[in-house]
């Protein structure tokens, strides 16, 4: 059985999708780590009976408290699914090429600090792009600059808004993220 930990800061829709995709497979979500005590992912973790670890910025950034909690679960892969904090270099060193992220644009465009969710979608629409998409990549010490694993794109029309783009991106995430996790962990 392969073991994954999911890090999330928001609603947790990708985490739940991953859970359902792997329900009868040899991949198990052994824990969800969350940095936001008001995040929707907490309710999802409780409902799905997935162990939840809540942590604060100091424990994550300046101590090895979270590192030890992660190590206790013996993960084969750490999946960032809407997690908004930069991963400390010491954690990347503990899990080289074992931390992946999904980003809601075709990197290298619209990546970097502060570029997540609605901020990305608004920037894409304001730039009048004709396509957007998702990038799944390994995590390194720089925001959104790790080696790419996979990209998928969607076409945009002049009628698209940040909201309609978000819906298109969400469909791409649901369709591709679990399959790329499966390929990456094998």
Language-model segments: which ranges?
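One-carbon transfer enzymes
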Residues: 1-186
């Amino acid at each position: 059985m392969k073991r994954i930990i999911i890090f999330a800061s928001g609603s947790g829709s990708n985490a739940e999708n991953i859970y359902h995709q792997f329900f009868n497979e040899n991949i198990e979500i052994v824990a969800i780590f969350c940095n936001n005590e008001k995040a929707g992912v907490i309710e999802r973790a409780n409902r799905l009976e997935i162990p939840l670890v809540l942590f604060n910025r100091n424990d994550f950034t300046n101590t090895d408290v979270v590192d030890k909690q992660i190590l206790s679960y013996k993960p084969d892969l750490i999946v960032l699914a809407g997690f908004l904090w930069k991963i400390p270099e010491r954690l990347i060193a503990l899990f080289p090429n074992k931390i992946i992220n999904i980003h809601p644009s075709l990197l290298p465009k619209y990546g970097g600090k502060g570029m997540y969710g609605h901020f990305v979608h608004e920037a894409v629409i304001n730039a009048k792009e004709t396509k957007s998409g998702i990038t799944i990549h390994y995590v390194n010490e720089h925001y959104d600059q790790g080696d790419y694993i996979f990209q998928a794109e969607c076409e945009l029309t002049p009628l698209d808004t940040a909201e309609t783009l978000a819906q298109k991106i969400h469909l791409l995430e649901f369709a591709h993220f679990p399959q790329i996790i499966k390929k990456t962990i094998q």
